[in-house]
Amino acid sequence: MAQIDDFKANLIGGGARANQYRVTVTPPPGIAIGLDVRRASFLVTASQLPASTLGEIAVPFRGRNIYVSGDRPPPETWTVTFMNDTDFMIRNAMERWQNGINNFAENTGAISPADYQTDLTVEQLDRDDTILKSYIFRAAYPLTVGAIELTNAEATEIETFEVTWRYQHFEPSGVV
């Protein structure tokens, strides 16, 4: 029968903590958005490490199916929640980015994906800021800049908003 000491001996490092992470948003090369990358990283309040999914193919054989792996489906979107400061620096940057892709008023914008897509990173950290695991989201751009709720009922909370990113694929560390 397993003992508590056996369990503790197998929890190397004490377990990864959900609140120890860093998100880095790199501005796109072709659109000036005015983002302070270091400050934006501090104002992230929530994110997630991505799921990994493989497709499957059912192969019928004498009334039953066997399954073999298929292609990867298109990736899910990735969402980051930011605190909103009184200068609206991050929100303004995200709106400038979207406006550079497709202008709010004129339906014009960047043509080449190389101008508006960039790489984003999320890193799982140890309690001493050592990077335990990282994911690079390749060729990403802000798909949705979420609403900010305004209400009289929340006098003691700082505004937050979500940005949902579309990316082409992600690259996890420690896999290859």
List each model region and its residues:
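Glycine-rich, low-complexity intrinsically disordered segments
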Residues: M1-V176
